[in-house]
Amino acid sequence: MAECLSQTDKGVVLSVHVQPRASRNELAGLQGESLKIRLTSPPVEGAANKLCREFLAKLLGVAKSRVTLVSGDKSRHKRLLIEGVTLDEVRNKLL
């Protein structure tokens, strides 16, 4: 799991692979060097990006405003910054 996480000055950057239009929102293990996340929303007009941020914020117990999309706006492969948390906190909550 360490491959998909990196510590920065602001928090932790998480690499994810998003599978939209799934039957439910869930973590689905690792895919390569990314955490795979299945989401119910379609990849239309940023709906999957929004749900991805909300889902991770809920899992990590942080405000939605502290989860920011860094890259991958139009891609299934995304990098998200979770502000104000440590690598160990994210690792413990997502495992």
UniProtKB/Swiss-Prot annotation:
Family: Belongs to the UPF0235 family.
Pfam families xref list: DUF167 (PF02594)
GO cellular component: cytoplasm
NCBIfam families assigned: DUF167 family protein
InterPro entries, alphabetized: DUF167 (IPR003746), YggU-like_sf (IPR036591)
PANTHER family (UniProt xref): UPF0235 PROTEIN C15ORF40
Lineage: Bacteria, Pseudomonadati, Thermodesulfobacteriota, Desulfuromonadia, Desulfuromonadales
Residues in coiled coil: none
Protein's recorded name: UPF0235 protein Pcar_0617
